[in-house]
Swiss-Prot record:
Outer (ODAs) and inner (IDAs) dynein arms contain the molecular motors that generate the force to move cilia by ATP-dependent reactions. There are two mechanosensory systems that monitor and respond to the mechanical state (curvature) of the axoneme. One system involves the central pair microtubule complex and radial spokes and the second system involves the outer dynein arms. Keywords: Acetylation, Cell projection, Cytoplasm, Cytoskeleton, Dynein, Leucine-rich repeat, Microtubule, Motor protein, Phosphoprotein, Repeat. GO terms for cellular component: cell projection; cytoplasm; dynein complex; microtubule. Part of the multisubunit axonemal ATPase complexes that generate the force for cilia motility and govern beat frequency. Component of the outer arm dynein (ODA). May be involved in a mechanosensory feedback mechanism controlling ODA activity based on external conformational cues by tethering the outer arm dynein heavy chain (DNAH5) to the microtubule within the axoneme. Important for ciliary function in the airways and for the function of the cilia that produce the nodal flow essential for the determination of the left-right asymmetry. It comes from the Eukaryota. The modification Phosphoserine is found at residue 56. This is Dynein axonemal light chain 1. The modification N-acetylalanine is found at residue 2.
């Protein structure tokens, strides 16, 4: 089997293709590398101007080495092999959007550090307990959540009470699974 692509190699390819210096670029796309990236290695720390980083559709197992990304606002890690959210603390003060659907995340430990997170797309993961889901209420700015395809959502959607139960536990949500959230008290005002 082919050896994994390193971040350094992927950045060199990206630089060649775009004629931009990775250290100066605001948006860097390293998705769907062949062979796939397996590790978020220390080369990421050179991306000091990066505001949007896409590493989706690779084989990354751990979130790591984000400490140099002082301006990161959008991180795309969908379709990888990520099992937990450890490693996000380095971008806790800047990250506004986390796209992490189609991974293997069961627990939301570590999510509370995301002080500015407004958008969380984490469909098709493995979250099955309300005890984990309620950790999302600790995010002061979270407004838009996509959670479809997690065992918890599937169970409660089948029972017909997903939206009601989810918005009760995370009341600040304005959008859930792509649909605007309509609050009971707002309906009465009309």
């Amino acid at each position: 089997m082919a050896k994994a692509t390193t971040i350094k190699e992927a950045l060199a390819r990206w630089e060649e293709k775009t004629s931009q210096k990775p250290s100066e670029a605001r948006e860097i796309k390293l998705y769907a590398q062949i062979p796939p990236i397996e590790k978020m290695d220390a080369s990421l720390s050179t991306l000091s101007n990066c505001e949007k980083l896409s590493l989706s559709t690779n084989c990354i197992e751990k979130i790591a080495n984000l400490n140099g990304l002082k301006n990161l606002r959008i991180l795309s890690l969908g379709r990888n092999n990520i099992k937990n959210l450890n490693g996000l603390e380095a971008v806790g003060d800047t990250l506004e959007e986390l796209w992490i659907s189609y991974n293997f995340i069961e627990k939301l430990k570590g999510i509370h550090v995301m002080k500015k997170l407004k958008i969380l797309y984490m469909s098709n993961n493995l979250v099955k307990d309300w005890a984990e889901f309620v950790k999302l209420a600790e995010l002061p700015c979270l407004e838009d959540l996509v959670f479809v395809g997690n065992p918890l959502e599937e169970k409660h959607s089948a029972e017909g009470n997903w939206v009601e139960e989810a918005t009760k536990r995370v009341p600040k949500l304005k959008k859930l699974d792509g649909t605007p959230v309509i609050k009971e008290d707002e309906e009465e005002d009309n």
